[in-house]
Structures are given as C-alpha cells and as structure tokens.
Amino acid sequence: MAKFDNQICLIADDYSTARRLIKDSLLHIGFSCLEAENGNQAIAIIQQTTLDLVIADINMPEKNGLELLKDIRADENMKDLPVVLTMLEPFEDLIFDAKKLGMNDYLVKPFDVFTLSKTLDKVIKTTGGESL
C-alpha cells in the first residue's frame, strides 16, 4: 500500500460519518486531513491552505462536488489541485460530466483503504504529487 507522508488532504462531505471513515483511512496511509461539511467551506479552506489533494462528495448541500470542482478548475491558483469525487452510485452521465470538468478520479462508496490508496497513488503520480 502506498504511503503519503507529509501530504495534506481536504475531505469535503456533508455526512460526518463519511468524513470520519475517509479520514481514518487517509491517516492510516500517511495523510494529514482537514474537513469541510460543504463545498463553500471547502473553497474557503482551499484558498487559505496548501493542499495536496481534495476528496469531495459529489452530492453536498450549498455547493455540490461538481460545483466545487468547477470552481477549483476556474481559479488560477487552485486549478492543478488533484480532485477525487466520491459517490454512492457510479452514474455514467455524472462521471462523464465530472471528467469534462477536470475530475482526476472517483471512488464509489463504500470503499476500503486499499482501493483508496491505489486510487490516490495513481492520482498523485499522474499530477506530479506536488503541493500547490
């Protein structure tokens, strides 16, 4: 399993249980974690913090994962930040739209730490693994 020591991930999900489960898995593979309950909180954190990765639920209140992704890609300072979206059902049209907006990858809930690690290893290697 890949180790991601000294890398910081923002977890954006409106369900505290989902955030906790994702955080526990991320801590297990070496990430430090920050949390947001919605897309608006996530944007505020991203603008103030150096991050290596964002994992966001596609279906959140106030600003959903697609809207968050669109805002990240539109901002010159954030546009290269790797974004992995999470979802309960892998609807093809949703995945297609997210890829068009610049999603790096996605995970279908529930997922285990091995699947998370494998996905993030691929995403970090593809994007160069550098903090913004």
Range-by-range predicted roles:
Residues F111-D121:
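C-terminal output helix
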Residues T49-I55:
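Active-site beta3 strand of CheY-like receiver
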Residues M60:
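Receiver (REC) domain active-site loop signature in two-component systems and cognate sites
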Residues R20-H28:
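Charged docking surfaces used in two-component/phosphorelay signaling
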Residues G30-E37, I45, L107:
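Short hydrophobic/Thr-rich beta-strand motif most characteristic of the beta2 strand and flanking loop
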